[in-house]
Curated annotation (Swiss-Prot):
GO terms for cellular component: cytoplasm. The active site is at 164 (proton acceptor). Specifically methylates the uridine in position 2552 of 23S rRNA at the 2'-O position of the ribose in the fully assembled 50S ribosomal subunit. It comes from Aliivibrio fischeri (strain ATCC 700601 / ES114). This is Ribosomal RNA large subunit methyltransferase E. The gene is rlmE. S-adenosyl-L-methionine binds at residues 63, 65, 83, 99, 124. Keywords: Cytoplasm, Methyltransferase, rRNA processing, S-adenosyl-L-methionine, Transferase. Its EC number is 2.1.1.166. It catalyses: uridine(2552) in 23S rRNA + S-adenosyl-L-methionine = 2'-O-methyluridine(2552) in 23S rRNA + S-adenosyl-L-homocysteine + H(+). SUPFAM superfamilies: S-adenosyl-L-methionine-dependent methyltransferases. It comes from the Bacteria.
Length: 209
């Protein structure tokens, strides 16, 4: 691909980004990313987050979901966040930087969490996309499997789970796996999710334990 094509593509992305009403609204409201509107819409429909809850936020950086979760759970609740990327501190959020796929990082995260005491696990994780679907989809599915494994280790009975999943190979099997573990499972495509994106959010409540 030529430099001109790359530059043109980058230019279009930047223009779309800065013209995006959700980007502008996030900046106006003091949130770190437009992704906050995805969890806000899920919350408005499904009421996952309540005062006093303990929440685990996977793939948290730059922190939009954690910001929103802290507002919902209040001073009596807690948010434990993890990402491979750095994240500026947020009051009320315990942040661990590291690769969630590494056992040492997972162990460090689990040390901050009491077993069976987490009310909500939420994951907005996504791999670095190469543009090659045959490579990207398995990477994405691996991450959502890890998020589901986290539920098995820390989620309280009747707890909730929301996870970003890319539609494609492995999606149907994963959805069935989630349905086996939770009483109610819904698929959401938030308004703020770009129409061309394959992403959807699985929202699962009533963890069977």
């Amino acid at each position: 691909m030529s430099k001109n094509k790359v530059s043109a593509s980058s230019g279009r992305w930047l223009k779309e980004h800065f013209d995006d009403k959700y980007v502008l609204e996030a900046q106006k409201r003091g949130y770190r990313s437009r992704a906050i509107f995805k969890i806000e819409e899920i919350q408005n429909k499904d009421k996952l987050l309540k005062p006093g809850m303990t929440v685990v936020d996977l793939g948290a950086a730059p922190g939009g979901w954690s910001q929103y979760a802290v507002e919902q759970v209040g001073d009596e609740g807690q948010v434990i966040a993890c990402d491979i990327l750095p994240m500026d501190s947020i009051a009320g959020v315990s942040f661990l930087q590291g690769d969630f796929r590494e056992e040492a990082v997972l162990d460090a995260l689990l040390e901050r969490i009491q077993p069976d005491m987490v009310d909500v696990v939420m994951s907005d994780m996504a791999p670095n996309m190469s543009g090659n679907l045959a490579v990207d989809q398995p990477r994405a599915m691996y991450l959502v499997e890890l998020a589901l494994d986290m539920c098995r280790q820390v989620l309280a009975p009747n707890g909730s789970f929301t996870v970003k999943v890319f539609q494609g190979e492995g999606f149907d099997q994963y959805l069935q796996e989630v349905r086996n573990m939770f009483k109610v499972v819904k698929i959401r495509k938030p308004d703020s999710s770009r129409a061309r994106s394959r992403e959807v959010y699985i929202v699962a409540t009533g963890y069977k334990g």
